[in-house]
Amino acid sequence: MIKQRTLKRVVQTTGVGLHTGKKVTLTLRPTSANTGIIYRRTDLYPPVDLQVNVKSVGNTVLCTCLINEYGVQIFTVEHLSAAQAGLGIDNIIIELNAPEVPIMDGSASPFVCLLLDAGIEELNSAKKFLRLKQTVRVEDGEKWAELRPFNGFTLDFTIDFNHPAINVDTQHCFFNFSSASFVHNISRARTFGFMRDIKDLQSRGFALGGSFNSAIIIDDYRVLNEDGLRFDDEFVRHKMLDAIGDLFMCGHNLIGSFIAFKSGHTLNNKLLKTVLSCQEAWELATFSNASDLPLVF
C-alpha cells in the first residue's frame, strides 16, 4: 500500500517573520500515523496546538493564517505547507516560538531542504488522498478558481499584471505535479511585492521582515533585486506554490486538476471549503500499489 509519511528525526532552523520582523525558531518533529499536521506555539504557556484543517484557516488577506477557538493564531503557513505537500508529508509537529512561520528567502525551498535533511519515514498506515469527483468553481469578480476531476494533480494558473517587469508571455503556467518537479520548478519561486505597497504596509506595522533577501521587490519599472529572477515566469510560479500550500490545508494531497485566474489565498481557501462542504464532490482514496497511484513522490 501507499503509506503515510512523517520525518525520521527532529530538525530546527531560525529565520525572521515576514510581518513581525522578529526572529523565529522553527522546529519540525516526527509523529505517529493519523496525527495529521499540528502547529505548536511554544512561546505560550502552556504551549498551544493548532490542528491543520480547513476549519482552522482564519485571515487570508496577506497570507494564510491558522486560528483556534480561543483566538490563538499562526501566520504565513503557506510556504511550509507547500513544501509538505510537495514531499507528501502527512504527519508532523511544527513548533514555533512566535506567532509566525519564518519567511526565509520567500520561497518554499528552504523548507524543502529542511524536510529532506530530516529524512522521510514511511508509516504502517495507508496514505489518504482527497480525490475530486465533481467540478467545483468559485468566483470573485473577474477572479476565479476551479477544481476538476483528474487522475493526477495538475495546476493551470494565469495572473494578470500590467507591469513592465512582468512580461505578458510569462503570466501563465501549467504544472503536472511530481515531487521532483515541484522541488526543482516550483518550490524555488519567491513571493513578490511592489515597493510602494511594502512602504505602505510597513507604515501600518506589516511586512516588517520584508527585504531583498526574502522577496522579489518591484518598483514601477523593474525588478530591484540584484540577482534578478530565478525563472522568467517566477511570479506565476509563486502563485502556484501558494495554491499548493493553500489546498494542502485539508491535510491531504489532492487528486484533481486546479485551474485559476488571478486567484490568491482568499479564493483558494474559499474553493477548498466549497469542495469539502459538498460531500458528492470528493472522496478519500487509498492505493494498494504504487502502479495505481497517479502521482509521483
Swiss-Prot record:
One of its GO terms (cellular component) is membrane. InterPro entries: Ribosomal_Su5_D2-typ_SF (IPR020568), UDP-acyl_GlcNac_deAcase (IPR004463), UDP-acyl_GlcNac_deAcase_C (IPR011334), UDP-acyl_N-AcGlcN_deAcase_N (IPR015870). GO terms for molecular function: metal ion binding; UDP-3-O-acyl-N-acetylglucosamine deacetylase activity. Zn(2+) binds at residues 79, 238, 242. SUPFAM superfamilies: Ribosomal protein S5 domain 2-like. Catalyzes the hydrolysis of UDP-3-O-myristoyl-N-acetylglucosamine to form UDP-3-O-myristoylglucosamine and acetate, the committed step in lipid A biosynthesis. This is UDP-3-O-acyl-N-acetylglucosamine deacetylase. It comes from Blochmanniella pennsylvanica (strain BPEN).
